[in-house]
Design a protein with these regions (language model features):
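Domain-level signature for proteins that mediate thiol-based redox and metal-cofactor handling
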Residues: 1-73
C-alpha cells in the first residue's frame, strides 16, 4: 500500500477534485491519497467524488484554514 500526497492549496474548486481524478489513474487498489486543500467547497466536493468513484474517504479534518483528507483506492 502506497501513500501519495497532493497539495491542492490555492486551487479554486473544482480544481482539487480534478487533480484527484488525474492522480487516481496512477493509484492501485489499496493505495491511499492524502489531499490538502483550502477551497470553500472541498469537503463536500471530496465526499461527492468518493461516492461517485466508489472510493473510501478514510477521514477528513481541518488543518488551519485548509482541510486534509485521506482517500483509499
Amino acid at each position: 500500500m502506497a501513500v501519495n500526497t497532493l497539495d491542492a492549496r490555492g486551487l479554486k474548486c473544482p480544481q482539487p477534485t480534478l487533480k484527484i481524478t488525474i492522480m487516481s489513474t496512477k493509484m492501485k487498489a489499496g493505495d491511499v491519497l492524502e489531499v490538502l486543500a483550502d477551497c470553500a467547497t472541498f469537503e463536500q466536493d471530496v465526499r461527492d467524488w468518493c461516492a461517485r468513484s466508489k472510493k473510501v474517504l478514510l477521514w477528513i479534518r481541518p488543518e488551519g484554514t485548509a482541510k486534509r483528507c485521506q482517500i483509499q483506492f
